[in-house]
């Protein structure tokens, strides 16, 4: 048996591997890799559509459209072919695998920045079935998140992967020039697997006046890039002379006629004698695009038939027929479905969009080529084929995408190769959390893609060294007690107390455990006046690894005065502040502002909870990280509702920022516990019951019951590495009655000296596992090169080296932060002050330790600032509106409207208070149209023609805005239009002769009678200039 699945390799990485399809088709063939390379040019609008057929067996892999904004139509640009035209050398073929990358990296002349984004979607169907191909709407074609990707920068690019839709697909006739001996061969394309569509066509006896006509028109979608035949049967019965004209119009995706493709057929019986006559409808048969492929893909065929009465008097006719439209090759699998649409928008005109890819084929060469090309039989391997079917049927769990970003595809190639390996060590399988698919896929460990993400590096790294301790062969973390209370009890770390699990809780049953290797299970708290909620944790305790810790529930409990008195060491516990209150027994960093809490809280282990009594420990482990915050707000919501002494029948995990719930990691390990207990896990991470905001949390809690004593029901099998040493599929549900279940003697296994040395390098102490996960997660987010190296080490099976590299790097973060020079620290402080002056506040301690301000820091700070501004405005609205204060608290009002897109208007608030639907748009008011300000621009006395033209411009703006006045941009455009109108009127005015004022000649007598003072002044001026007094 093979150790790897070669066909699966070529499906996931077609550029490097090629292999036969291991199905039942046994035909001699050759395997051929055909490249696809194109440089498409964007149009003037900067918007276009690339259509790809990822499963097509022919040379046509897709085509390119450009959006014409002037006509609002898609204009066909060109086909996308493989480098070799397959039909020239091969008779038959079928697709093995393929991939296609689309990106842009070349700028046109005069452009200095690469702009634009891609939206891509894979859907099962043909192009003509989609009503809207626009960039904004293309992602709505499918709801499957694995089949679409949006807002990808054109410089980053996307990848289209050809995943098979089935097997045992027949070879397809590629189309050859036949017969080859003729000097002018006829082009025959896809002579098999045709698609026939048709129907009945009938016109009852109809009378048409002299020289009149009767018209019939219909259209049918064909989605073809090859020949189309339209065949008729039946007959037309008529009186006297008639002319029948049939127009066949191939249409493109915009619904317009394809240029130079219309065919017209005319039949006439002019000149016959009066009386009844007949026409066989097959006279209207037509064949399209047989000699040459269509100039662009044909979306539909429109047929228009005109029946004309050639006589001068009334005449009747009737038609009884049927028609068939044959799309040659239209039924071939993959030729026009599934379809991938890649829309782009915002790119500069002339930008080169590069398409590069490869399609692998099984091909049957024509006889001339067979002489020099040896062929082999197909490969049939039911074992490999079954394995691939299981892989593809679990593609959602495995994260196999049909379209993705290029970066995601490159990362996927690094770890998806594990899917192709049949022999995966059981211990390695346990570290990758493969147990959910072990039974399904031939007992072969298949990794879930989610657990291979960088944030799970410490869990992955445990494969070689740390897994021996964490998931050892002894206690292994298998729950061993049976609890009828609905909550996990004693686990392996409290085995000596497991006997009391099925009896009612009483203090006499909970004696302190004297063994120092365990936390003391010695306290029962009265929590009947507290609100509470459960959450899962992942922990490691000092130098001992507790196998059951990944399967332990904690509980967030509100602190009342009575509970404070029951916890004497409360003031000695670590705490942090959130929402105006303290959270005890927790060490969390980077805690951001959250909604206001109603009480202090404490985080405790939950061994049992029954009738307001909580079995816990006086020496609980400290909780690190922020994944418990959602449970705190769930408990706080119960406190608001007055639900005390019991917890919802659910667990919660998620960080909280403002009123939003963030994603966390470690989900697979946490789900192992909640799935085995049969309780849902709520959060905003993939695979959980979705809670995105605190508002939706409130709705979810109302639907949940509470934890109560109940009869256990069997749940899905639960598996861990240690229990696999006995039976990897045994049921370890702690609710089941299995009294004869053996109890392991060794409950905790110390870390080996070799593993200890890995963690204690540079004199470091062993942190808790959550601290390591949080530290390594943060470090990997900042060092992408480490992420790439991590996947490389996994692929080589070097788990121990991975532990060394990741853990040492993470533990030395503080050392690296000290290397920030004083000069750089000053520059960072100046940048921070500048951001604060703009109202942007970032985490200064994190920035100074990292040594730089990232774009994500500023974007997050700006989002928080905007939320705070919206919060402040809503609180002002609340304080100024007495009606709201009568019905809602300020927190409820602010929490509700923070979830909406915009601030409410007065009318919306009034409708909301009445319980009406405020979300509907308010009908526009009829506003007075302001013409005066624009007419005044024409001057003091405009003509009536100019004033009417200005009013038309203003009316056009109001009509476009549905009665609303112009926006600032529209007002600017309107002013420019009025100025152009003035300029145009000045240019077109008839030229008038300039008026020359009459020249006034002063008589000599008038000059002599000038005042004496003026004559004296002129005389003095002339003497100063040295002029003569006498003027000739």
Curated annotation (Swiss-Prot):
<feature type="site" description="Cleavage; by protease VP4">
    <location>
        <begin position="500"/>
        <end position="501"/>
    </location>
</feature>
<dbReference type="InterPro" id="IPR002662">
    <property type="entry name" value="Birna_VP2"/>
</dbReference>
<feature type="active site" description="Nucleophile">
    <location>
        <position position="627"/>
    </location>
</feature>
<comment type="function">
    <text>The precursor of VP2 plays an important role in capsid assembly. First, pre-VP2 and VP2 oligomers assemble to form a procapsid. Then, the pre-VP2 intermediates may be processed into VP2 proteins by proteolytic cleavage mediated by VP4 to obtain the mature virion. The final capsid is composed of pentamers and hexamers but VP2 has a natural tendency to assemble into all-pentameric structures. Therefore pre-VP2 may be required to allow formation of the hexameric structures.</text>
</comment>
<feature type="site" description="Cleavage; by protease VP4">
    <location>
        <begin position="431"/>
        <end position="432"/>
    </location>
</feature>
<dbReference type="InterPro" id="IPR025775">
    <property type="entry name" value="Birna_VP4_Prtase_dom"/>
</dbReference>
<dbReference type="GO" id="GO:0030430">
    <property type="term" value="C:host cell cytoplasm"/>
</dbReference>
<dbReference type="InterPro" id="IPR029053">
    <property type="entry name" value="Viral_coat"/>
</dbReference>
<keyword id="KW-0378">Hydrolase</keyword>
<keyword id="KW-0479">Metal-binding</keyword>
<keyword id="KW-1035">Host cytoplasm</keyword>
<keyword id="KW-1146">T=13 icosahedral capsid protein</keyword>
<feature type="region of interest" description="Disordered">
    <location>
        <begin position="986"/>
        <end position="1014"/>
    </location>
</feature>
<dbReference type="GO" id="GO:0005198">
    <property type="term" value="F:structural molecule activity"/>
</dbReference>
<dbReference type="Pfam" id="PF01767">
    <property type="entry name" value="Birna_VP3"/>
</dbReference>
<dbReference type="GO" id="GO:0008236">
    <property type="term" value="F:serine-type peptidase activity"/>
</dbReference>
<comment type="function">
    <text>Capsid protein VP2 self assembles to form an icosahedral capsid with a T=13 symmetry, about 70 nm in diameter, and consisting of 260 VP2 trimers. The capsid encapsulates the genomic dsRNA. VP2 is also involved in attachment and entry into the host cell.</text>
</comment>
<feature type="domain" description="Peptidase S50">
    <location>
        <begin position="501"/>
        <end position="723"/>
    </location>
</feature>
<feature type="active site">
    <location>
        <position position="670"/>
    </location>
</feature>
<dbReference type="GO" id="GO:0006508">
    <property type="term" value="P:proteolysis"/>
</dbReference>
<feature type="site" description="Cleavage; by protease VP4">
    <location>
        <begin position="483"/>
        <end position="484"/>
    </location>
</feature>
<keyword id="KW-0645">Protease</keyword>
<dbReference type="GO" id="GO:0046872">
    <property type="term" value="F:metal ion binding"/>
</dbReference>
<feature type="site" description="Cleavage; by protease VP4">
    <location>
        <begin position="723"/>
        <end position="724"/>
    </location>
</feature>
<feature type="site" description="Cleavage; by protease VP4">
    <location>
        <begin position="474"/>
        <end position="475"/>
    </location>
</feature>
<dbReference type="Pfam" id="PF01768">
    <property type="entry name" value="Birna_VP4"/>
</dbReference>
<dbReference type="GO" id="GO:0039621">
    <property type="term" value="C:T=13 icosahedral viral capsid"/>
</dbReference>
<dbReference type="InterPro" id="IPR002663">
    <property type="entry name" value="Birna_VP3"/>
</dbReference>
<feature type="binding site">
    <location>
        <position position="23"/>
    </location>
    <ligand>
        <name>a divalent metal cation</name>
    </ligand>
</feature>
<protein>
    <recommendedName>
        <fullName>Structural polyprotein</fullName>
        <ecNumber>3.4.21.-</ecNumber>
    </recommendedName>
</protein>
<keyword id="KW-0167">Capsid protein</keyword>
<keyword id="KW-0720">Serine protease</keyword>
<keyword id="KW-0946">Virion</keyword>
<feature type="region of interest" description="Interaction with VP1 protein">
    <location>
        <begin position="1021"/>
        <end position="1030"/>
    </location>
</feature>
<dbReference type="Pfam" id="PF01766">
    <property type="entry name" value="Birna_VP2"/>
</dbReference>
């Amino acid at each position: 048996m093979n150790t790897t699945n070669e066909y699966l390799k070529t499906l996931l990485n077609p550029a490097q591997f090629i292999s036969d399809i291991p199905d039942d088709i046994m035909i001699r063939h050759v395997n051929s890799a055909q490249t696809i390379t194109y440089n498409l040019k964007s149009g003037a609008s900067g918007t276009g559509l690339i259509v790809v057929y990822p499963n097509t067996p022919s040379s046509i892999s897709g085509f390119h459209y450009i959006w014409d904004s002037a006509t609002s139509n898609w204009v066909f640009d060109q086909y996308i072919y493989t480098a070799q035209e397959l039909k020239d050398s091969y008779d038959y073929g079928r697709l093995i695998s393929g991939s296609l990358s689309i990106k842009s990296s070349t700028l046109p002349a005069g452009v200095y920045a690469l702009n634009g984004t891609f939206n891509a979607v894979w859907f099962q169907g043909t192009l003509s079935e989609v009503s809207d191909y626009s960039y904004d709407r293309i992602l709505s074609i499918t709801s499957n998140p694995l089949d679409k990707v949006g807002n990808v920068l054109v410089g980053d690019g996307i990848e289209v992967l050809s995943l098979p839709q089935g097997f045992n697909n027949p070879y397809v006739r590629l189309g050859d020039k036949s017969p080859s001996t003729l000097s002018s061969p006829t082009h025959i394309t896809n002579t098999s697997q045709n698609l026939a569509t048709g129907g009945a066509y009938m016109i009852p006896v109809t009378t048409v006046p002299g020289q009149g006509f009767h018209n019939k028109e219909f259209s049918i979608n064909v989605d073809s890039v090859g020949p189309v035949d339209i065949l008729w049967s039946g007959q037309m019965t008529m009186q006297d002379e008639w002319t029948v004209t049939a127009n066949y119009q191939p249409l493109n995706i915009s619904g317009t006629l394809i240029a130079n493709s219309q065919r017209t057929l005319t039949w006439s019986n002019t000149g016959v004698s009066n009386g009844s006559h007949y026409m066989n409808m097959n006279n209207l048969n037509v064949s399209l695009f047989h000699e040459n492929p269509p100039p662009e893909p044909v979306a539909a065929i429109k047929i228009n038939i005109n029946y004309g009465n050639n006589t001068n008097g009334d005449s009747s006719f009737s038609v009884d027929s049927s028609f068939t439209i044959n799309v040659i090759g239209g039924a071939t699998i993959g030729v026009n479905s599934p379809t991938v649409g890649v829309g782009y928008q915002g790119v500069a005109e002339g930008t080169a969009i590069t398409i590069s890819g490869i399609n692998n084929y099984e091909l049957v060469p024509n006889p001339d080529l067979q002489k020099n090309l040896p062929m082999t039989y197909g490969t049939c391997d039911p074992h490999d084929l079954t394995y691939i079917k299981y892989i593809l049927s679990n593609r959602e769990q495995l994260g196999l995408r049909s379209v993705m970003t290029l970066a995601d595809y490159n990362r996927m190639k690094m770890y998806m190769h594990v899917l192709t390996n049949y022999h995966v060590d059981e211990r390695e399988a346990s570290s990758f959390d493969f147990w959910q698919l072990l039974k399904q896929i031939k007992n072969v460990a298949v990794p879930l893609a989610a657990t291979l993400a960088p944030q799970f590096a410490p869990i992955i790294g445990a494969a070689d060294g740390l897994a021996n301790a964490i998931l050892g062969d002894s206690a292994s973390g298998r729950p061993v007690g049976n609890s009828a209370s609905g909550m996990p009890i004693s686990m392996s770390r409290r085995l000596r107390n497991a006997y009391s699990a099925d009896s009612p809780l009483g203090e006499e049953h909970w004696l302190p455990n004297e063994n120092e290797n365990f936390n003391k299970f010695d306290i029962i708290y009265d929590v009947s006046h507290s609100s509470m909620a459960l959450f899962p944790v992942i922990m490691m305790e000092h130098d001992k690894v507790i196998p059951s810790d990944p399967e332990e529930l904690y509980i967030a409990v509100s602190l009342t005065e009575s509970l404070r008195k029951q916890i004497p060491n409360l003031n000695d516990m670590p705490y942090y502040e959130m929402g105006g209150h303290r959270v005890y027994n927790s060490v969390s960093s980077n805690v951001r502002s959250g909604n206001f809490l109603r009480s202090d809280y404490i985080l405790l282990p939950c061994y049992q909870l029954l009738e307001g009594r909580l079995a816990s420990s006086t020496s609980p482990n400290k909780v690190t990280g922020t994944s418990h915050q959602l449970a705190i707000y769930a408990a706080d919501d119960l406190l608001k509702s007055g639900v005390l002494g019991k917890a919802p029948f659910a667990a919660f995990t998620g960080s909280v920022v403002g009123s939003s719930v963030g994603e966390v990691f470690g989900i697979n390990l946490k789900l192992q516990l909640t799935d085995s207990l049969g309780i849902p896990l709520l959060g905003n991470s993939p695979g959980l019951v979705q809670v995105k905001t605190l508002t939706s949390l409130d709705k979810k809690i109302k639907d949940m019951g509470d934890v109560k004593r109940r009869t256990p029901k069997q749940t899905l099998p639960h598996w861990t590495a240690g229990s696999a040493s006995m039976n990897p599929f045994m049921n370890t549900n702690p609710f089941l009655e299995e009294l004869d279940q053996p109890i392991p003697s060794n409950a905790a296994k110390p870390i080996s000296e070799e593993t200890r040395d890995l963690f204690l390098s540079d004199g470091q102490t062993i942190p808790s596992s959550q601290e390591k996960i949080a530290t390594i997660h943060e470090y990997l987010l900042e060092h992408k090169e480490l992420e790439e190296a991590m996947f490389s080490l996994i692929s080589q099976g070097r788990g121990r080296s991975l532990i060394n590299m990741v853990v040492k790097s993470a533990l030395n973060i503080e050392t690296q932060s000290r290397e920030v020079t004083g000069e750089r620290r000053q520059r960072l402080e100046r940048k921070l002050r500048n951001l604060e002056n703009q109202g942007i506040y970032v985490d200064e301690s994190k920035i100074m330790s990292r040594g730089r301000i990232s774009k994500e820091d500023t974007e997050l700070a700006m989002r928080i600032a905007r939320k705070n501004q919206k919060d402040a405005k809503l609180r002002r609205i609340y304080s100024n509106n007495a009606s709201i204060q009568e019905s809602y608290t300020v927190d409820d009002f602010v929490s509700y409207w923070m979830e909406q897109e915009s601030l409410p208007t007065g009318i919306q608030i009034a409708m909301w208070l009445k319980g009406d639907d405020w979300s509907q748009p308010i009908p526009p008011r009829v506003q007075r149209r302001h013409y005066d300000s624009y007419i005044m621009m024409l001057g003091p006395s405009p003509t009536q023609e100019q004033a009417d033209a200005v009013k038309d411009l203003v009316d056009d703006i109001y009509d476009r805005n549905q009665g609303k006045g112009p926006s600032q941009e529209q007002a600017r455009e309107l002013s420019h239009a009025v100025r152009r109108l003035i300029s145009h009127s000045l240019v077109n005015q008839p030229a008038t002769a300039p008026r020359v004022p009459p020249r006034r000649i002063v008589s000599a007598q008038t000059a002599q009678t000038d005042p004496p003072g003026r004559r004296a002044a002129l005389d003095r001026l002339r003497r100063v200039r040295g002029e003569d007094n006498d003027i000739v």
